[in-house]
Every structure is written in structure tokens, then in C-alpha cells.
Amino acid sequence: SLFKKDIEFNNLGTLIIDEEQKFGVDQKEFLINRYPQIHLFSLSATPIPRTLQMSLLGLKELSIIRTPPSNRIAIRTYVQKYEQVSFLTAINNEISRNGQIFIVVPRISHIPFVESEIKKLNLDISYRIGHSKMKEKDIEEVFLSFSNGEIQCLISTNIIESGIDIKNANTLIIFNSNLFGLSQLYQLRGRVGRSDKRAYAYLFHDSEKLINKTALKKLQVLANYENLGSNF
């Protein structure tokens, strides 16, 4: 609504843009041009190249937050070709400590495969599904049931990329992770490890014969930068 021309502010002094990478250049320029005197703060864990370059060139002031919240523990990140035994182990380890699990796929059409794997492995877990094609009220109901601990596992697309804070969910399993962008993976990994418990992220990918070296290197970069306060 801020981008509508018929909305006016009498004395707007400060504008904070969270998740800055999700806004387009035209949207940000519109606000800057319309309110040239305001103090503007942009927040992002994964800044777009244009914003990062302007900061490094000194055209924008840059501050880096390196201190994590107290009691946080680094997320253990594993990159590997998908194997049923790894999937089984990841789920059983989290369930054994009464935790919850995010399972993420890049496309809605991949969800049936995950469900079939759960059945093949006889995994006794309760789960719900969430994706962008569902009605908004249905998505909210699924998220609420997961947040309240009524189900153990949430299978979804990357709609959980931001705005989700569930401290009891400390295992993230991503299928076909090579189909996600690096910033998407970074944001998704941030859905776990939001308490004082050790969190785990499993980035499953296709056979190394089926993905190119660049995609594999991208995944490995994320695994290498798993310490608290690290970035790329």
C-alpha cells in the first residue's frame, strides 16, 4: 500500500525496508524519490548484487551484524546426493528429541515423491502440506497447526522462506536443492536453529552426474559458511 500514489504521510521521518532483496528497484526508487528527506534503513541477510555493490563503493553506508542472538548454536549443514537411509536418519533423529521438521521442495509437483518416500520407509510421523496454490486461509491453518505442535512435519515449497519462527523445528530437509538459488537456500536454512538447540539442514540433490559443477559448488558454499555470523 505504500507504493500507491494516493497515500500521503504528513511527517514521515524513517523508513525501514526488511527483506530488502524482495523489493524491486523501481519500488525502492519510488519511495526514495517521493520522500527524499527520510532516513532509509534496508535490512537483508542476502542483499541483491546492486545493493551490495553500491555499499562496497561507498554510495550507501553499510553495517554488518555479526553477533548472533544469545544461546544460538551453529546449524550443521550437509550436502549430499539423496539416499533413503539419510532421509530416514534425519527424521528419526529429530523425532527422537521431540522436535519438528521442515521438508522443502522446489516445485509443487515434487510433493507426491516426498509422501511416497515417507510411506515406503514406514515413517510414523504426522504431517501437513503447504504451497502457494492453496487458499490463504488453508495455508494459515496448516502453519498454525505446525506452530502449535499438532503435527511433526511440514512439507512445503519455499513459501516458508521468511516470516516463520518455530523454535521447536530444528531439522530442515530440502529435496532437489540444486534447483534453488543460493539466497533462497540461505533464507530457508534460517528457518531452523532459532533456539538453543542444535539444528540440522540436509541439502539433498540429484546424482552428481545429473547436475553441473556450478550447481554443486553453490551448495558446497552454503555448507562451508555454517558458523554463526558467517556470510558470503
Where are these regions (language model features)?
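Post-DEXD/H (motif II) to motif III coupling segment of the RecA-like Helicase ATP-binding lobe
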Residues: 8-96
